[in-house]
Amino acid sequence: MTVLHSIDFFSSSSAPVAIEARAPQSAFPEHHHDFYEIVIVEEGAGVHVFNGNPYTLSRGCVCFVRDHDRHLFESTDDLFLTNVLFRAPDAFRFLSGVGHFLPRECDGVYPSHWRVNGQVLQQIKCLIACLEHAPKSDRVEDIALHESVFMQLLVKLWQGCQTQAGDDQEGRLYQLLDWLQNNYSEAVEWPELADRFALPLRTLHRQLKNKTGMTPQRYLTRLRLLQARHQLCYSDNSVTDIAYLCGFGDSNHFSTLFKREFSQSPRDLRSQL
């Protein structure tokens, strides 16, 4: 597995933060690094496989990667990212309490993926632009100013995550996307789901396609296929059981869709492991 080292990304040993833009981000194999990373999705779509678990990416996704996490990007489609790198939450000279504004693992569950709305993405652009420039010098005041901008960015993201589930259409669409990520195996009737999240059905179709580049049904099918691939790799369940566990009513249809998506059948994938 590829290991990325901080010496290759930070401008100096004293620089607390580095910015790496990916415009666009192409597919990138599984890797980890000796620093922390905040991945901010500005445009496009793709799949982020984080510690073996697949997450679909779209505009407004924010991913928090620790120094012991492994991840990769695949199926990217005009995926524009900004990566904010920092050495560790406790590695700043003048900041404390950074961890309060980062995801916290609880009972073995790490909420690595957040969502923020377009307004927050716009607000943080100027902060990212400031962070792109290394501190003017190694003087304590320049380091302190640089670190203070990073803290502003963290607070903006944290506040944006807390408020993204607001009662406007964009907030309700984000709630729906999160619901699908966690309930992909359930039978979905789109008119009922639209009512549940107080979205007109046509608006749901239009906005979801605008956010993800896919129709709602295509998005759901892809979620299910990604989860099925994960189970094929990391569980002992049979192909038939996995098909049903991931929301497919027929294992033959599942195999057909899987081969169309990944250019190999579920059994072929299993045989390679």
Curated annotation (Swiss-Prot):
Site entry (Interaction with sigma-70), positions: 241, 250
PROSITE patterns on file: HTH_ARAC_FAMILY_1 (PS00041), HTH_ARAC_FAMILY_2 (PS01124)
Family annotation (InterPro entries): AraC-bd, AraC_XylS_family_regulators, Homeodomain-like_sf, HTH-like, HTH_AraC, HTH_AraC-typ_CS, RhaR_RhaS-like_N, RmlC-like_jellyroll
Residues in HTH araC/xylS-type domain copies: 174-272
GO molecular function: DNA-binding transcription factor activity; sequence-specific DNA binding
DNA-binding region: 191-212, 239-262
UniProt KW keywords: Activator, Cytoplasm, DNA-binding, Repeat, Rhamnose metabolism, Transcription, Transcription regulation
Primary location group: cytoplasm
Keyword Lipid metabolism annotated: no
A cellular component term, taken from the record's GO annotations: cytoplasm
Localization, UniProt: Cytoplasm
Self-association state and partner proteins as the record states: Binds DNA as a dimer.
Matches recorded under HAMAP family: HTH_type_RhaS
The protein's name in its UniProt record: HTH-type transcriptional activator RhaS
Species the sequence originates in: Yersinia pseudotuberculosis serotype I (strain IP32953)
